[in-house]
Amino acid sequence: MKTNCWFNRNRLLSHLPGSFYVLALAVASLTLPSAEAGQPGPASGGFNPCFNFAGPPTQTGPNTIIIFNVTATLTGTFTGSAIITERDVIHADGSITLHGSGIFTDQAGCGTFLFTYSGKGSAVDGSESAHFVGGQGTGCFAGLHTEGTFQGNLVGPSGQCAVAGQGTYSGQILFAP
C-alpha cells in the first residue's frame, strides 16, 4: 500500500499551532513569580493586656458571660499593639472558656494582621492559656500565616484597666502567597 506523503505532511502541519500554544504557555509560566512558601520560623515574645468591660456581665444559668474590650502591647517577634474583643464564659466552678479576635499593628506602622484565639482560664488563680492563629496581613505582614499558643496571668485593676495582666506567646510564623 502506498502512503500519501502530502496527506501526512498536512496532518503534521495541522497540529503545529496547538503545539505552539502549549509551548508558549509553558514558557510563559516560567516567568511567573513562584507560589512557593518560605520556611516556617519561630515566633515568641511577651504581651501586657488591659481589659475593660464592653458592657455589664450577664448571667446565663450558672454561667457569667463577660465581653471585654482589650488593648495589648506586644514585644518580641510581634512588636506593637493589638485591639481585641474577648468573650469569657465563667463557669460555676471558676473555670473560664475564652474566645477573642483582633487586629495587630506593628510598632513601626509597616503593617497589620488579623488573629483569633480560643482557650481556657481560671477565675480562681487568674491563669489563662489559648491557641491563636493569624493571617490576612497588610504591608510587611502580607502573606503572613502564624499559629501558636499563649499563656498569662491576670491581676486586678491597674491604672486605666479593669483587669490587667502579662504573659508570653510562642509559635510559628510563615510567609506564603
What annotation goes with each model-predicted range?
Residues 31-37:
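Signal peptide processing junction and immediate N-terminal pro/mature segment
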Residues 11-31:
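Bacterial N-terminal signal peptides
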Residues 2, 17, 108-110:
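Acidic, low-complexity intrinsically disordered regions
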Residues 37-177:
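Beta-strand-enriched cores of mature, soluble protein domains
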Residues 1-14:
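N-terminal secretory signal peptides that target proteins for export/translocation
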